[in-house]
């Protein structure tokens, strides 16, 4: 076991929802800080809020984190209620709501939303959810944020109140300036899927926006790296699943090539992100072998 100087979480594989309880219980028994789960609509993955609710009930200390939940695909009021419910039921210190906009047109078509306006919609959603989490009704929302609620204006408030005042901890993912600024406008921190060589600049930009907006303290900085650890069949499984997941981007081969598959590579990445000031590093697993949890535990 190595002291890597930062908290380390596990990103859960999406290929077999029934196996996630095993992963969660092993991670809880180990040194890991957080369970993370990605989001897609038109894909064979579990719905993250439902799955993480089950995992939270099967564990007692480990955080549960969406990374990232595609908020623009969802009804805003219902999402606010779901997140507040899970935050309340886990004591206000275990849910981390990682949010992003997504880039798949088929996800947006299935949800009946517009890919082209997804960033603006997320900002509008945050304006509403923050109000709802503070116990305010719909009154006045829509007067300046571009949202239209028709007959819903004046309805509410919508409970339950979250255990954490103002709502669960919110992280934003993304790479563009608008996404990084969103951290300072609405969030508590940043979730980066970039390698350390790139993430340092993103972290600095987020810190700059944080100061520009007059926010107290420092933004929480979370990094994500894709890993697989085990015999050749485990590595082959992870590579195949990663390639299928990223095929739509045209960069599947590049993503697979960046998969970290040795203890030395993973330790180096953990140290690099700790040196950049990351508060946590998520080790994201695509392969289904749950023994990876124990192998990774030996590194952290």
Label each residue range with its predicted role.
Residues 1-300:
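Active-site-adjacent structural elements that line small-molecule/cofactor binding pockets in enzymes
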């Amino acid at each position: 076991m190595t002291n890597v100087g930062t908290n380390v979480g596990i990103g859960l594989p999406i290929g077999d929802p029934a196996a996630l309880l095993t992963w969660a219980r092993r991670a809880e028994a180990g040194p890991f800080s957080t369970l993370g789960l990605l989001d897609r609509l038109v894909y064979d993955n579990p719905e993250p809020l439902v799955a993480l609710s089950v995992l939270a009930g099967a564990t007692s200390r480990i955080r549960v984190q969406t990374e990232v939940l595609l908020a623009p695909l969802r009804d805003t009021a219902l999402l606010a209620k779901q997140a507040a419910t899970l935050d309340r039921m886990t004591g206000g210190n275990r849910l981390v709501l990682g949010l992003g906009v997504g880039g798949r047109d088929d996800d947006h078509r299935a949800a009946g939303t517009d890919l082209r306006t997804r960033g603006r919609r997320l900002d509008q959603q945050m304006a509403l959810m923050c109000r709802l989490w503070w116990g305010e009704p719909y009154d006045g929302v829509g007067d300046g944020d571009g949202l239209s609620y028709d007959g819903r204006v004046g309805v509410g408030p919508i409970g339950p109140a979250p255990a954490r005042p103002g709502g669960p901890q919110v992280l934003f993912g993304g790479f563009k300036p608008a996404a990084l600024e969103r951290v300072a406008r609405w969030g508590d921190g940043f979730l980066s899927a970039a390698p350390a060589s790139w993430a340092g600049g993103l972290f600095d930009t987020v810190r700059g926006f944080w100061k520009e907006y007059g926010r107290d303290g420092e933004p929480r900085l979370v990094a994500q790296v894709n890993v697989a650890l085990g015999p050749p069949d485990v590595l082959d499984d992870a590579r195949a699943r990663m390639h299928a997941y990223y095929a739509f981007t045209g960069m599947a081969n590049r993503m697979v090539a960046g998969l970290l598959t040795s203890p030395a590579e993973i330790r180096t990445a953990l140290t690099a992100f700790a040196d950049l000031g990351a508060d946590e590093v998520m080790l994201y697993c695509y392969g289904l072998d749950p023994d990876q949890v124990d192998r990774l535990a030996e590194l952290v």
